[in-house]
């Protein structure tokens, strides 16, 4: 609490020093111009006083406008007011130090110019100290309400709650219509990778509980809703015939060793009737 009071007091001190320095610069510049001996220095002092007045006066103008008019949050006027209210303190420190250099070039000839130069240095150092203050932290974001995401390509809808660990995924038409995908799916079914008994009616709901290895992790439930494909028997048989290789058929009654054949000479004699 005491630190906050210190920073607030330092801020108002910097504003007061800035306005006072601008007034001194304009006053000394006007007097130097009226003397007519150092007109270039007089113009420089007047220019420096005007620049400091703009930098410091923007804060007071913003405060006055905030009292007279109510700006909507996020509007252009509100952003301009915030910029004027929190103009860079470190940038002011550098600018005031650079502007004070010319005030010490001829301190013997124009001794009274060292007064606004010293005030510029003091004001710059005060702003440098103010720049070390930490910025106010933004308020914590409010927990977002559950969002819903839709993927048009797969017609999948996912609903995720920020406070709930349950996730639900719904898939409509998970299998794409086409000869390639249908062929691959039916081929896997016919080969036995997916038994017919495991098939369920269309639009059934399967619940799978996923438990991570870490015992401290929360349980998640994933729900899948899938549409099954009905297989036409004729098309399945045609695909099975196209994929299956020709099989060799053997008979159990076929003898393993063929009977011996009669010699060719004896068979010819028998045919002529000699025996």
UniProtKB/Swiss-Prot annotation:
Residues 238-250 have a biased composition (Acidic residues). Residues 141-163, 236-262 are annotated as: Disordered. Keywords: Membrane, Transmembrane, Transmembrane helix. The chain crosses the membrane at residues 16-36, 41-61, 86-105, 109-131. One of its GO terms (cellular component) is membrane. Pfam families: TMEM72 (PF16054). InterPro entries: TMEM72. It is found in: Membrane. It is a multi-pass membrane protein. The keyword S-adenosyl-L-methionine does not apply. Residues 147-163 have a biased composition (Polar residues). This is Transmembrane protein 72. It comes from Homo sapiens. The gene is TMEM72.
């Amino acid at each position: 609490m005491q630190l906050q009071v210190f920073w607030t007091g330092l801020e108002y001190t910097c504003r007061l020093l800035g306005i006072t320095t601008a007034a001194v610069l304009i006053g000394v510049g006007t007097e130097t111009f009226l003397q007519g001996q150092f007109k270039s220095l007089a113009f420089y002092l007047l220019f420096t006083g005007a620049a400091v007045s703009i930098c410091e006066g923007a804060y007071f103008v913003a405060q006055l406008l905030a009292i007279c008019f109510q700006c909507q949050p996020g509007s252009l006027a509100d952003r301009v007011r915030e910029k004027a209210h929190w103009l860079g303190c470190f940038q002011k420190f550098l600018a005031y130090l650079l502007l004070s250099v010319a005030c010490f070039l001829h301190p013997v000839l124009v001794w009274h110019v060292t007064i606004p130069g010293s005030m510029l240095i003091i004001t710059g150092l005060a702003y440098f100290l103010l720049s070390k203050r930490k910025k106010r932290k933004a308020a914590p974001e409010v927990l977002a309400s559950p969002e819903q995401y839709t993927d048009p390509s797969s017609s999948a809808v996912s609903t995720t709650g920020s406070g709930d660990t349950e996730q639900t995924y719904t898939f409509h038409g998970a299998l794409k219509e086409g000869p390639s995908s249908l062929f691959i799916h039916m081929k896997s079914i016919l080969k036995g990778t997916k038994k017919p008994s495991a098939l369920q009616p269309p639009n059934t709901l399967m619940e799978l509980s996923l438990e991570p290895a870490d015992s401290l992790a929360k349980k998640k439930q994933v729900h899948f809703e899938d549409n099954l494909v009905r297989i036409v028997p004729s098309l399945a048989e045609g695909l099975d015939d196209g994929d299956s290789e020709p099989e060799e058929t053997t008979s159990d009654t076929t003898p393993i060793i063929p009977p011996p054949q009669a010699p060719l000479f004896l068979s010819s004699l028998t045919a002529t009737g000699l025996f």
